[in-house]
């Protein structure tokens, strides 16, 4: 997360809500963050959180305009590049999205989220081996990211690395906070059982 941000705690809270919560909850936090940025008179943060509100509402073109404005105020804001890239993915602009992820990595190379999201995109377009490298880089920066282990497990599964995938899924379960993400937890436990059965049948 951008260390140059004037609202770092709010950005982290919003990121957690987007990753593990609901769209409604994330929108509520984004609007509260926007109000606080306005009260503090932080134009770059105002544009960033306006972009987040539009992104959550799935108004991707409008969100891009706000993220571009945020970047003009703070050219070192890796999160703004990252979220612009995510909007481009939603609009089907894949090659340029990859370039924006790279720009974010260039200006903020220690921001794990960008590596995670670039890995997510690479995995989705069939570049699984490359995706694994980006997920592992994200985890080297932020070892407790359950969502990254989840995506790493999927990429390894796509590469038929069943043992590696199983280990990654088990790591997800160990990192999820007790009582939260129940639906995600059930899904992952089912995947673990499926992989264990597959490995048992193959004698691995």
Q: Which sequence ranges carry the predicted segments?
A:
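Conserved alpha-helical positions within TPR/SEL1-like repeat arrays
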Residues: 15-19, 45-56, 79-90, 113-124, ...
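TPR/TPR-like (Sel1-like) alpha-helical repeat modules
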Residues: 150, 154-180, 193
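Structural marker of alpha-solenoid helical repeat scaffolds
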Residues: 36-40, 73, 107, 141, ...
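Canonical positions in the second alpha-helix
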Residues: 33-36, 69-70, 103-104, 137-138, ...
């Amino acid at each position: 997360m951008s260390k140059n941000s004037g609202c770092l705690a709010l950005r982290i809270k919003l990121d957690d809500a987007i990753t593990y919560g609901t769209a409604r909850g994330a929108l509520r936090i984004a609007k509260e963050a926007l109000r606080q940025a306005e009260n503090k008179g932080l134009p770059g943060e105002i544009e960033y959180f306006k972009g987040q509100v539009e992104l959550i509402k799935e108004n991707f073109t409008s969100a891009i305009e706000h993220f571009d404005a945020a970047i003009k105020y703070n050219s070192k804001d890796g999160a703004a590049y990252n979220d612009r890239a995510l909007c481009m993915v939603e609009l089907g602009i894949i090659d340029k999205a990859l370039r924006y992820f790279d720009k974010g990595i260039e200006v903020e190379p220690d921001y794990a989220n960008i590596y995670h999201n670039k890995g997510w995109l690479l995995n989705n377009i069939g570049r699984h081996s490359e995706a694994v490298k980006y997920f592992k880089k994200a985890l080297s920066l932020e070892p407790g990211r359950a969502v990254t282990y989840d995506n790493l497990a999927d990429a390894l599964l796509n590469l038929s690395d069943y043992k590696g995938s199983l280990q990654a899924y088990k790591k997800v379960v160990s990192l999820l906070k007790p009582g939260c993400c129940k639906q995600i937890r059930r899904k992952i436990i089912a995947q673990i059982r499926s992989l264990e059965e597959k490995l048992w049948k193959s004698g691995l």
